Regions:
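Targeting/processing segments of secretory and organellar proteins
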Residues: 7, 22, 33-36
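Sec-dependent bacterial lipoprotein signal peptides
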Residues: 25, 44-71
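Bacterial Sec-dependent N-terminal signal peptides
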Residues: 53-55, 67-90, 455-457
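N-terminal module-boundary/linker segments of secreted carbohydrate-active enzymes
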Residues: 76-122
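Loop/turn elements at helix/coil->beta-strand transitions in domains of secreted/extracellular proteins
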Residues: 89-92, 122-127, 195-201, 262-267, ...
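Second-shell loop/turn segments in exported
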Residues: 96-103, 170-178, 241-245, 268-270
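Catalytic-core segments of thiol-dependent peptidases
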Residues: 132-135, 139, 143-164, 175-261, ...
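Terminal, contiguous helix-loop blocks that mediate binding/assembly
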Residues: 227-474
Length: 474
């Protein structure tokens, strides 16, 4: 065998300690049987000698066999036996993390959630995660708490003293499309069947573009222009819009998929870009009582679940603190994150129809009103903007002395509670980096309402006129 110039194999934590090889890349473990089997991908250049290589091959074979046996375990045969699950949980929180090119960030999200659960915050509630660790493989996991710590590996990712992972279901299908409406319904329904609860919360992580239709639904003549329009600038930092092209669910399809589950969520939390869009929120108003979302891009790291999850499992898991979630998100990006870009808002969906009724009065009274579009706050770096501040737009078209404007502002306070409309002084956008230092765009004082509209946008005017929000307000 001599010197082997390149050797890559899946090895366990113990091999690292035995051989001292460097350059390990952690991968999401193949969760199974109530425990966590930690794996690492290792690259070894110029392996020391044939004897060591034989020893390495021997250990790898043993580990491969162990992994085979491990993934074949029943729940009762896992390394750390599961405690009994409640017949009906106080709350089931579902993570729906879709796509593979945010994989490392999703793995960090899962790790952070485990870190929170390790502190014994679940009580009578449950947390399930849908994730796609690689193309062609999708799975539903459950994160649970146990007093046992049989398989704890100090310092290793996905290994905690008391939070463990169980694989409930796998899909090994290269054609599996997690953003197909039928698939969304199937997966969420499955999670609800496995973890029935008195109330449900849903966290959606992935790529978002607000209400804007998928490029494939724009007519063929405009398709390439649509793609070019949303192309990120060179050297852009990763956000939760970039990637997994061709696999998107438009908002009406998403709302229908949620509705087909028969569930009504207490809250939706969008860990995705541009989802605090009035057009998108209005489509989703029947799916949940509250929606947490950002009007601009969300950095690829997303929400900091180590600190967020305790707010979602308040009062021993029997309730949730959504304003606390917004505050925690804002605090993280304001004070701890490298890129200080964090804008967030909480929507009370039951107040969206009264808001639409007031906006209709204003739009009817001021049809075709001229205004300075350039003076409005926007939430991306595009030369031709798509997402404008909703309150700024209405204030621009409505006379300042009109009582309708006071009525609108009062209703905005009910629909988007002021204490949960939070923002950093500027936001990051992968679009139009040449126009702003380091991709950062300033939010002007007094111009942030936490929700966008595309009413002033001309590029997508025909599509915008087909939205439910347009029909409700015109």
């Amino acid at each position: 065998m001599g010197t082997l110039r390149f050797f890559e194999e899946v090895v366990s934590f113990k091999i690292r300690r035995t051989f001292g090889f460097a350059d390990y890349k952690r991968h999401l473990p193949p969760y199974a049987g109530g425990g966590v089997f930690l794996t690492f991908t290792k690259r070894v250049r110029n392996a020391p000698n044939e004897i060591q290589m034989k020893k390495l091959h021997h250990i790898v074979l043993v580990l491969a066999l162990a992994a085979t046996l491990f993934t074949g375990c029943t729940k009762d045969e896992g390394v750390t036996p599961r405690p009994p699950v409640p017949e009906t949980a106080d709350q089931t929180i579902m993570f729906y993390l879709t796509g593979t090119n945010l994989g490392s960030y999703f793995r960090k999200n899962v790790d952070d959630a485990m870190n929170a659960i390790d502190r014994n915050i679940l009580h009578n509630s449950r947390v399930l995660v849908f994730i796609q660790p690689q193309r062609g493989l999708s799975m539903v996991l459950e994160l649970y708490y146990t007093p046992r710590n049989d398989d704890y590996v100090p310092g290793a990712q996905f290994s905690y003293e008391h939070c463990k992972v169980d694989t409930l279901r796998r899909w090994a299908d290269a054609d599996f499309n997690s953003m197909d409406g039928g698939t969304i319904t199937e997966v969420i329904s499955y999670m609800a069947e496995q973890a029935p609860a008195r109330r449900y919360g849903l966290i959606l992580g992935g790529h978002g573009l607000g209400w804007v239709p998928d490029g494939t639904s724009v007519n063929a003549i405009r398709f390439s222009a649509f793609q070019d329009f949303w192309s990120p600038m060179p050297n852009a930092l990763p956000t939760r819009w970039m990637g997994d092209s061709g696999k998107r669910a438009e908002i009406p399809q998403l709302a229908a998929a949620f509705g087909n589950t028969g569930l009504h969520f207490d809250y939706l939390l969008f860990d995705a870009c541009f989802m605090s869009s009035i057009e998108a929120l209005y489509d989703l108003r029947g799916c949940a009582d509250h929606i947490i979302a950002s009007p601009c891009e969300v950095m690829a790291a997303g929400f900091n679940y180590t600190d967020i999850l305790p707010h979602l499992l308040a009062d021993a898991g029997t309730s949730y603190d959504l304003p606390g979630v917004c505050s925690e998100y804002h605090d993280y990006y304001m004070n701890r994150a490298t890129t200080k870009s964090g804008c967030i808002a909480l929507t009370v969906t039951g107040e969206l129809e009264p808001l639409a009724a007031i906006v209709k009065e204003i739009e009817t009274k001021y049809p075709g009103q001229t205004y300075d579009r350039a003076s409005l706050q926007t939430y991306e770096g595009l030369d031709e903007h798509v997402f404008y501040d909703l309150q700024g737009y209405i204030e621009a078209i409505c006379d300042e002395k009109d009582p309708l404007l006071d009525k609108f502002r009062a209703q905005m306070g009910k629909t988007f509670p002021t204490e949960s409309r939070l923002h950093t002084p500027s936001f990051y956008s992968v679009y139009g980096l040449g126009d702003a230092p380091n991709g950062m765009h300033t939010i002007e004082d007094g111009k942030y309402s936490g929700v966008t509209t595309s009413a002033p946008c001309e590029r997508f005017a025909p599509e915008w006129a087909q939205t439910s929000w347009y029909r409700a307000t015109h």
